[in-house]
């Protein structure tokens, strides 16, 4: 199982979510609709001075679905090369028992 974290410019949010939902059956995720911060080139604070904003999408996927998600995100990056899109995929260790 993998944890996928995606941070991207709000301008590509619809393309990303539609691509993932269309191509990965039962794609479940958590969406954090607005993030503020600083990327490599500029601030994204949602203000008059720094108007751009990011969003974050988190999902837990089986390995084949994580591979599909990576392919989908690569296609969106190719379509929108100037928009900030960062994808992080990590291994997940599941723990069971009393907490």
PLM feature segments, named:
Residues 1-99:
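Positively charged, small/polar-rich N-terminal and surface patches that mediate targeting and assembly
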